[in-house]
Amino acid sequence: MASLRIAPLALFFFLAASVMFTVEKTEAGIPCGESCVFIPCITGAIGCSCKSKVCYRDHVIAAEAKTMDDHHLLCQSHEDCITKGTGNFCASFPEQDIKYGWCFRAESEGFMLKDHLKMSVPN
């Protein structure tokens, strides 16, 4: 009787382990899984961007880039992001061999809190 209770748990762990090893193998330079010919990358939330009509991981795009002009979000300083108009912060990747960073828009919490406190409260 106890083996019937343990069987679903064993099946769950087997499936979880197989998914984990599948995801680990596809993380390197493999595309994120979709094309971006007509629509942007759906997997943008997990770090994918469009390059040559295929969605790739952001760190792969930065590692393979020859110049900053290869992708509109590549940067080497905050000023590059501001002049390109793609954000105001250039974040570098943890890998030391990637010489370009990635632009994104960043707002400090203190700035937003200051604006929130300026709002008038209706009586």
UniProtKB/Swiss-Prot annotation:
Keyword Transmembrane: no
Signal peptide: 1-28
Cleaved propeptide residues: 59-123
Cross-link Cyclopeptide (Gly-Asp) mapped to chain: G29-D58
Domain of life according to the entry: Eukaryota
Keyword match Ion transport: no
Record-annotated disulphide pairs: C32-C48, C36-C50, C41-C55
Post-translational modification: Contains 3 disulfide bonds. This is a cyclic peptide.
Pfam family, one: Cyclotide
UniProt GO BP: defense response
InterPro entries: Albumin_I_a, Cyclotide, Cyclotide_bracelet_CS, Cyclotide_sf
Assigned keywords, A-Z: Disulfide bond, Knottin, Plant defense, Signal
Function in brief: Probably participates in a plant defense mechanism.
Annotated domain remarks: The presence of a 'disulfide through disulfide knot' structurally defines this protein as a knottin.
Record family assignment: Belongs to the cyclotide family. Bracelet subfamily.
Protein name: Cliotide T12
Organism: Clitoria ternatea
Source species taxonomy: Eukaryota, Viridiplantae, Streptophyta, Embryophyta, Tracheophyta
